[in-house]
Amino acid sequence: MERNPNPNNLPVELNRTSLYLGLLIVFTTGILFSSYFFN
């Protein structure tokens, strides 16, 4: 593990994880709403 990580590497990783989290949340909420409306 590097003691001094690349400053340009951290925000990209954080952005990618937040993007995947947002997609997952949108996907789960979409499934919940679709089950709500079609039930």
Swiss-Prot record:
Chain ranges passing through the membrane: 18-38
Subcellular location: Cellular thylakoid membrane
UniProtKB keywords: Membrane, Photosynthesis, Photosystem II, Reaction center, Thylakoid, Transmembrane, Transmembrane helix
GO CC, any one term: plasma membrane-derived thylakoid membrane
Main location: membrane
InterPro entries from the UniProt entry: PSII_PsbL, PSII_PsbL_sf
NCBIfam families listed in its UniProt record: PRK00753.1
Family: Belongs to the PsbL family.
Free-text function comment from the UniProt entry: One of the components of the core complex of photosystem II (PSII). PSII is a light-driven water:plastoquinone oxidoreductase that uses light energy to abstract electrons from H(2)O, generating O(2) and a proton gradient subsequently used for ATP formation. It consists of a core antenna complex that captures photons, and an electron transfer chain that converts photonic excitation into a charge separation. This subunit is found at the monomer-monomer interface and is required for correct PSII assembly and/or dimerization.
Name by which UniProt lists this protein: Photosystem II reaction center protein L
Underlying gene: psbL
